[in-house]
Amino acid sequence: MTLTALGMPALRSRTNGIADPRVVPTTGPLVDTFGRVANDLRVSLTDRCNLRCSYCMPERGLRWLPGEQLLRPDELARLIHIAVTRLGVTSVRFTGGEPLLAHHLDEVVAATARLRPRPEISLTTNGVGLARRAGALAEAGLDRVNVSLDSIDRAHFAAITRRDRLAHVLAGLAAAKAAGLTPVKVNAVLDPTTGREDVVDLLRFCLERGYQLRVIEQMPLDAGHSWRRNIALSADDVLAALRPHFRLRPDPAPRGSAPAELWLVDAGPNTPRGRFGVIASVSHAFCSTCDRTRLTADGQIRSCLFSTEETDLRRLLRGGADDDAIEAAWRAAMWSKPAGHGINAPDFIQPDRPMSAIGG
């Protein structure tokens, strides 16, 4: 197992009496020293993207991962097979970058759908190319999609993404719903300047079309390291912007390990009722219930978006390691998962690897 430092200060994992940190489990679910079970696998297929969202990527000049470093379809299929059949993963989400740019997406989705037990299979996409791919992906075995959409105002969308592609995204949303990739969820990261206005229009748009809006607090994962807490909109800011326009009630259903805090929405007599979620990763962190394990496009396991270390499974794969060795390395990587992401710590330093190179 090879560990690659990311230039971040150590977030030292502490045990809470449930386990000996020196003894990594060799069977059972994928657990850490705090007793959390990771059964949700996020698989990044590429770091490339056809948008340039200001909170994620620079407008130009970002270096892509070399092609030879990216996992091949057979390598992805093998690692997902290990995760599902040996480590207890029940949900697989494909991410990027923009996963629709990965030529092997349909192939990997189909291979995942053939696994037994079959995991839930989902996709997070910017939606630009979804209109022409939704049907084929549904046939391959994809269950549902999350589409990133931060504004339905064309000028605001173009300013945030640095591309005038709103019409393509809206067409992708409609195609996903028509293909049965439901519930269709809309992920929004709000711009500090226009977000209070945008979120009202976004929620009404989603209610009218049967999509589920999820507003995500901006996290310090941009390539330009320009994130500032005092500028980014918080969950409380979002709710304050919505309350003058909608009647909101907390969803009484148990939240479990889901990242979104759900709200029931009444928009008045002319708009369907529904629900929306707020993912308050910064202001109300939910690290204690995190159930995710992450595989980057170049074959690294990350126990957390803000991990201080990565575990290199690609080297094991290409070095001839058997499934037992890969399973053991994966278990060890997750066993040392830190208690939390550390964003609120005074000595927090943003990771070198941006979100586009980790996978959402």
From Swiss-Prot:
The gene is moaA2. This is GTP 3',8-cyclase 2. Residues 33-259 form the Radical SAM core domain. Monomer and homodimer. It comes from the Bacteria. GTP binds at residues 42, 93, 124, 185, 292-294. Catalyzes the cyclization of GTP to (8S)-3',8-cyclo-7,8-dihydroguanosine 5'-triphosphate. It comes from Mycobacterium tuberculosis (strain ATCC 25618 / H37Rv). Pfam families: Mob_synth_C (PF06463), Radical_SAM (PF04055).
